[in-house]
Amino acid sequence: QSGRRQRQMCIRDRSHSGDINRTIMEQLLMVDALKRASAKRITAVLPFYPYSRQDKKALPREPISARLISDMYVAAGVDRMVSIDLHTQQIQGFVDQPFDHLTAMPLFVDYFKEKVDGPISIISPDAGGVKRATIFAKHLEAYVGFVHKKRDPKVHNEVKSFTVIGEVEDRHAILLDDIICLLYTSPSPRDVSR
């Protein structure tokens, strides 16, 4: 079909490729093609929002890559964006277009209610995820904890030590993180159970 004067959705699935930059570019090219074919409205669906951890400057002269991604999609012609479980809520404010932030949390809540019998502790792997862990724990009537990390600011993605803050003894500990790339900054089950 031509797509002319129709609403179009452009969904990016990263599962086929490990190269996020290529995947972004392919979706931008699809958006551009839809725009040039006179699509009425274009919605970009990004299940995982690329570069979402770079939503602010951590050091001087760093890019705000998550903002740049939004700008690129808008420049290509996107009228609406959809993503799932954003790293931070503020990403929605990077564009003036509608931005739907969906969550998969109900699926996980149902799963753990069915599979886990006994007391639970929801552990955030960092202080920044405590709000997410608290919401999750409320649905499971669980305790909340988090992992305090000691880092070397000069070494990217490396943690020197982990300390668990909260109750985990004699409980099922569920480590709740929003993005796990290489596991360099996440504690192991052994670290959490100490």
Where are these regions (language model features)?
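Glycine-rich anion/phosphate-binding loops
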Residues: 18-33, 59-68
